[in-house]
Regions:
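Membrane-interface junctions at transmembrane-helix termini in multi-pass inner-membrane proteins
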Residues: 144-174
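Interfacial segments at transmembrane-helix termini and the short loops linking adjacent helices
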Residues: 55, 100, 118-148, 194, ...
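Interhelical loop/hinge segments that connect adjacent transmembrane helices in multipass membrane
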Residues: 1-42, 81, 88-97, 219-249
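Helix-loop interface residues and adjacent transmembrane-helix termini in multi-pass membrane transporters
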Residues: 52-55, 89, 162-163, 190
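Membrane-interface helix-loop junctions in multi-pass transport and translocation proteins
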Residues: 1, 126, 140, 164-167, ...
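Alpha-helical transmembrane segments of polytopic membrane transporters and translocases
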Residues: 30, 45-47, 59-75, 104, ...
């Protein structure tokens, strides 16, 4: 069926385009490097903490990360919607307008969800993991505070990916690895489990701000403007509703 559709649409051809192949391979390599750095940055803290913390504290840290992770599922959904929307735009102004709407829509979910999570974290951890893991509550609350920085970083990364500018993403992830190492080296000996959580927040925030700085310098994107809420930002939720209905129909 897929082959028939491709043929009918005129996408199939025995002719090859060297320039197109080079462009696709180049984009894929840049995207892969950025992704590898991103994964390394996300796993580096646990690697270092497995040596720096006692096994019990490491277990509490993993629980804290696990319990706060679902907070950011909305950001992942927005990311999936944002990429094609930006890629469709021919002008930089259009790309930035779309980015702003989806970023603010994500914040409308992340910020209230974070406040609620901070309030119910003791009950949530006690219910899911048991009272023995309640010492992870403070670390989980601190990790949840990375929500805005995480949202900014993910949305800016998607903006760069859709605009075929992966260099800035790779640079920012490289900075993130450096920041993670330094923050853990300084904060874990001083504050233990809490220091590890603070280091993770710092490791999200500084690369996100660094990426924003580089993007502003290259494209003129106003980071302050991204936080200016508009009435039409709510339209994004209508698009989300339509997407979910299509999935249910499938």
């Amino acid at each position: 069926v897929a082959a028939f559709y491709v043929q009918k649409s005129g996408w199939a051809s025995v002719r090859t385009s060297v320039s197109t192949i080079k462009s696709l391979v180049g984009y894929g390599l840049r995207a892969h490097v950025a992704l590898v750095l991103q994964i390394a940055n996300r796993r580096l803290d646990q690697l270092i903490l497995s040596v720096a913390l006692a096994a019990s504290d490491l277990g509490l840290y993993v629980v804290a990360m696990t319990i706060e992770g679902p907070l950011f599922l909305a950001v992942t959904t927005m990311e999936m919607l944002l990429f094609p929307k930006i890629a469709q735009q021919l002008q930089e102004g259009g790309r930035q307008a779309v980015l702003g709407r989806y970023f603010r829509a994500a914040l409308l979910i992340v910020i209230p969800a974070t406040v609620i999570f901070i309030a119910i974290a003791p009950w949530l951890i006690g219910t899911v993991f048991g009272s023995a893991y309640l010492p992870a509550v403070d670390a989980a609350r601190i990790l949840a505070l990375s929500g805005i920085a995480y949202t900014l970083k993910v949305m800016l990364t998607t903006y760069m990916r859709a605009s075929n500018r992966m260099r800035i993403v790779a640079q920012s992830e490289g900075v993130g690895i450096f920041v993670t190492i330094i923050a853990l080296a300084v904060l874990v000996p001083l504050f233990g489990l809490i220091g590890a959580a603070i280091a993770q927040v710092v490791a999200f925030t500084i690369p996100a701000l660094f990426m924003a700085f580089l993007i502003n310098r290259e494209t003129g994107l106003s980071i302050v403007g991204l936080f200016r809420f508009e009435r039409r930002d709510w339209d994004v939720f209508g698009e989300l509703k339509t997407r979910f209905r299509r999935k249910e129909a499938e």
